[in-house]
Curated annotation (Swiss-Prot):
One of its GO terms (biological process) is DNA replication initiation. PANTHER family: ORIGIN RECOGNITION COMPLEX SUBUNIT 4. GO terms for molecular function: ATP binding; ATP hydrolysis activity; DNA replication origin binding; nucleotide binding. The keyword rRNA-binding does not apply. It is found in: Nucleus. ATP binds at G67, P68, R69, G70, S71, G72, K73, T74. Keywords: ATP-binding, DNA replication, DNA-binding, Methylation, Nucleotide-binding, Nucleus. Component of ORC, a complex composed of at least 6 subunits: ORC1, ORC2, ORC3, ORC4, ORC5 and ORC6. ORC is regulated in a cell-cycle dependent manner. It is sequentially assembled at the exit from anaphase of mitosis and disassembled as cells enter S phase. Interacts with DBF4. Interacts with POLQ. Component of the origin recognition complex (ORC) that binds origins of replication. DNA-binding is ATP-dependent. The specific DNA sequences that define origins of replication have not been identified yet. ORC is required to assemble the pre-replication complex necessary to initiate DNA replication. Binds histone H3 and H4 trimethylation marks H3K9me3, H3K27me3 and H4K20me3. This is Origin recognition complex subunit 4. Belongs to the ORC4 family.
Amino acid sequence: MSSRKSKSSNLIQADYISQVQRILRERFCHQSPHGNLFGVQVQYKHLIELLKRTAIHGESNSILIIGPRGSGKTMLINHALKELMEIEGVSENILQVHLNGLLQINDKIALKEITRQLNLENVVGDKVFGSFAENLSFLLEALKKGDRTSSCPVIFILDEFDLFAHHKNQTLLYNLLDISQSAQTPVVIIGLTCRLDILELLEKRVKSRFSHRQIHLMNSFSFPQYLKIFKEQLSLPSVFPEEIFAEKWNENVQSLSEDRSVKEVLQKHFNVSKNLRSLHMLLMLALNRVTPSHPFITAADLMEANQLCSMDSKGNIVHGLSVLEICLIIAMKHLNDIYEEEPFNFQMVYNEFQKFVQRKAHSVYNFEKPVVMKAFEHLQQLELIRPMERTSVNAQREYQLMKLLLDNTQIMNALQKYPNCPTDVRQWATSSLSWL
């Protein structure tokens, strides 16, 4: 009987864990509009007022949201649209068109996507239009019920806005902004970009039709605010089905935020990037370790997640190299030390390696030159070294100038973790200069 009870309690616990993971993963991955905004309240107020003027009063406009990747541009617009759609009578009478510069790579594809999102495929049918502007104006005309006041407002959201500026003649941007300046269908054009020089990319005729409204997003919060965000992002909502479990989870999150080792991890993360996307990645990796037998996140989970986040990919490649390839990298390191980061060629590296072999008088490192050349080429394929200029057909491979793409710290850290690294090779790496 007791085994049955323990089985059922384990199943209930597993169900709670899966619900926790679903809620938090949705929060971390999909930037759910149900979450909170951090440090952008002023910008949010500006944006929502602009959208309301279009949706309620039929006022056309255009605006750019500018900020580095991960600063919350998409989250800001999603929150604003959610609030707008909750206003009575707005959701039925407003249309949204979402375009992305990475997907809609030219105006023709963009126009097809606009047609699809506005559900106007049946209106266009087999009609033939002379120009892009004619086609677009016909589509917008189809949305009109009568005069300006009764036309259906359209919100155009252009993600990766700077890529649309590279379209031929910027026809799409010109026509959308032209409509926003004229007394036609009420439209608001919202551009999302990470480029501060975006206005310099616009043609004069496009720039003259843009309202020059801009919202800048910069992650300017302090570490105490970052710690508060950490707590809020990990905490379960009050509507969680099991109150007792949610209370225990939130108490654990509170104790984590006060833990010294956790604060150190978060401080390191904060110093590298204030980007909330990188914080979400850290929390996601820690959340993956939660199981029915390990129901709460611990400080050790966060420390391990931080190690995974800050893992050096090039350093990891070095762990899988052969001893010969490691020796060549050490030879390059010494050449960099002697010649102060000047480029080197294979012959120089080979000579440096030979000094080590002769000094140690080891037959184990006595490789034929073609074998050493093959190892050198493998390092180039792994992109641990790169040629300084394009390879000429007639150029001898031994004398092509190369540059090492690892610094001394990366090499030494990788050697510390290298499995069964020979002692004399490690000593050679730590010697101040080469074997002169």
